Amino acid sequence: MFDVTLLILLGLAALGFISHNTTVAASILVLIIVRVTPLSTFFPWIEKQGLSIGIIILTIGVMAPIASGTLPPSTLIHSFLNWKSLVAIAVGVIVSWLGGRGVTLMGSQPQLVAGLLVGTVLGVALFRGVPVGPLIAAGLVSLIVGKQ
C-alpha cells in the first residue's frame, strides 16, 4: 500500500537537504525511522513530550556558556549597561514571548505545523534565510490569525 505520509516526510527531508537545513532533515529522517520500525508505538509519547524535551535541550544549549564559564559574570553585568545589549535583551524578551505564543498555537492548531515547516525550508532555500525554527514563526502567525 502506498504511504502518502512517508512520501511527504521524504519530500520535506529532501527540502531540508537542498536548503542545507540539516536540523530539519535529520529530524525528519529520525521520524521516518520511527515510522517504519516498531518504534512507531512511541509516537503518542513523542507527540505529547517532544516539544517540551526539545525546549529543554535548546535551553541547555543556550545556557551552556554561562554554566561553563565561557560567558563570564562580568559580561552579563555589562550587558545591562550598554544600549545595544539592552536592545538585545528587549528583542530576546519579545522573541521568547512570540515563541510561547507559537507553542500554544502549534498545540491548538497542529495543522499549521506543516505549513510552518515548509515555509521555513523554502525561506532558507530560496531567500538564503536562516532556519530559526517554527516556534517563532508560529508566534508570528498567532499574531495574524489569533491564538485559539
From Swiss-Prot:
The chain crosses the membrane at residues 14-34, 51-71, 86-106, 121-141. It comes from the Bacteria. It is found in: Cell membrane. InterPro entries: UPF0756_TM. Keywords: Cell membrane, Membrane, Transmembrane, Transmembrane helix. Pfam families: DUF441. It is a multi-pass membrane protein. GO terms for cellular component: plasma membrane. The keyword Cell inner membrane does not apply. Belongs to the UPF0756 family. This is UPF0756 membrane protein YeaL. It comes from Escherichia coli (strain 55989 / EAEC). The lineage of its organism: Bacteria, Pseudomonadati, Pseudomonadota, Gammaproteobacteria, Enterobacterales.
